[in-house]
């Protein structure tokens, strides 16, 4: 009986994975994307998405975030929000080395609303979103290239699609870096973020107010 239950759970998770892959690919194919960087793109195949889900799992395991962001299937980190997300990834030497997603608001609402409602933002803007799953395979100190490319991807989706503002949960210590991008405001201060016992912030981000620093260093204008 226990084995049957376990087999059913595995089957249900695989069905869920297939639905996530199908709907995420469909959503990403409808988005407008304009980038000269061939290594930075939206996920549009099942193989690409599985690589992204693997990278999320590997990095979250390495940095101890699995309690807050658990795998749905062991070794694969995905959830229902992927279905309405621009899932961006960067390749280095033909290997997925970084990924980020911009979730568009839907009937599922947004993941950080488990901590704080964004209804006031919905009242102000036609379409809100949330930036999450900001994953870089090799983390160093300071501004690394992968982070730069991922934020260029977020900017790209914003400028070319119908979304007005995004919220994002970050560690308080990272605010100084994000402020440099321009268009960043503190939405809410938190003593912790779920199981992550560290001071955090929910910030709002509007790339339409990109700083000169962002345009010069990130966009290379």
Predicted regions and their residues:
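Short acidic N-proximal helix/loop "leader" segments that mark the beginning
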Residues: 1-35
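Short amphipathic alpha-helix that is part of the acyltransferase structural core
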Residues: 27-76, 87-89, 96
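Short, solvent-exposed loop/turn elements at beta->coil junctions and helix N-caps
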Residues: 72-79, 190-193
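A short helix-loop-beta-strand connector motif used in the catalytic cores of GNAT acetyltransferases and
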Residues: 77-88, 98, 109-110
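Active-site beta-strand termini and strand-to-loop segments that position acidic
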Residues: 90-93, 205
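Short, His- and charge-rich active-site/binding loops that engage polyanionic ligands
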Residues: 92-121
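Acyl-donor binding region in acyl/amide transferases
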Residues: 113-207
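C-terminal helix-cap and adjacent tail motif
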Residues: 204-221
């Amino acid at each position: 009986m226990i084995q049957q239950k376990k087999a059913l759970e595995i089957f249900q998770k695989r069905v869920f994975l297939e639905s996530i892959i199908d709907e995420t690919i469909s959503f990403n194919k409808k988005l407008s994307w304009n980038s000269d960087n061939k290594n930075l793109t939206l996920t549009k195949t099942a193989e690409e998405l599985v690589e992204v889900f693997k990278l999320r799992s590997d990095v979250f395991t390495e940095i101890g975030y699995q309690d807050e962001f658990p795998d749905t299937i062991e070794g694969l980190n995905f959830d229902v929000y992927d279905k309405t997300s621009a899932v961006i990834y960067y390749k280095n030497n033909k290997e997925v080395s970084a990924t980020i997603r911009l979730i568009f608001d839907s009937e599922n609402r947004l993941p950080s609303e488990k901590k704080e409602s964004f209804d006031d933002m919905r009242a102000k803007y036609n379409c809100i979103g949330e930036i999450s799953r900001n994953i870089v395979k090799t983390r160093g100190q300071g501004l690394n290239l992968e982070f730069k490319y991922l934020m260029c991807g977020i900017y790209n989706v914003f400028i070319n699609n119908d979304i007005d503002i995004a919220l994002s949960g970050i560690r308080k210590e990272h605010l100084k870096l994000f402020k440099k991008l321009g268009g960043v405001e503190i939405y809410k201060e938190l003593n912790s973020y779920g199981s992550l016992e560290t001071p955090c912030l929910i910030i709002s981000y509007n790339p339409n107010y990109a700083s000169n620093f962002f345009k010069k260093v990130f966009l290379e204008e």
